[in-house]
Regions:
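Surface-exposed interaction patch
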Residues: 1-63
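C-terminal, structured domain-capping segment
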Residues: 2-10, 66-120
Length: 120
């Protein structure tokens, strides 16, 4: 994420919503989902912003989950003119249950990032 504004911003919220018949599951050891029924269409997701802590899906809600509900370390960006701090990297990973045939060109989830001004 790159902040090209003249003010500081932060990632204030991140949520994920399952789509197209897929369900959210806990992200963890791949072996956990590998033992699920074939074509059960479950996936776990992990996300980290900047050098911040990984946020993981869990088993509490299979359709939509909030991964981040307030800005934490790694979520803050300065404005234009400070190239050392006006962007953050995003790293992510996913695990899925076995499928009987390849799944291609299918959006199984959407991830929503809410960016807000960082009022100092």
């Amino acid at each position: 994420i790159v902040n090209n504004s003249f003010g500081a911003v932060k990632v204030a919220n991140v949520s994920i919503e399952a789509a197209q018949g897929w369900s959210l599951a806990a992200f963890g050891d791949k072996a956990t989902l590998a033992h699920e029924k074939v074509n059960s269409n479950k996936f776990g997701f992990s996300l980290a912003l900047g050098n911040g802590e990984k946020k993981l899906t869990d088993n509490k809600n299979t359709s939509k989950q909030t991964l981040l509900d307030s800005a934490v370390e790694g979520c803050f960006m300065s404005g234009v003119g400070d190239t050392s701090a006006n962007s953050i990297g995003i790293s992510y990973d996913a695990i899925v249950t076995p499928v009987s045939e390849a799944v291609t060109n299918t959006a199984i989830a959407s991830v929503l990032f809410i960016i807000a001004w960082d009022a100092v």
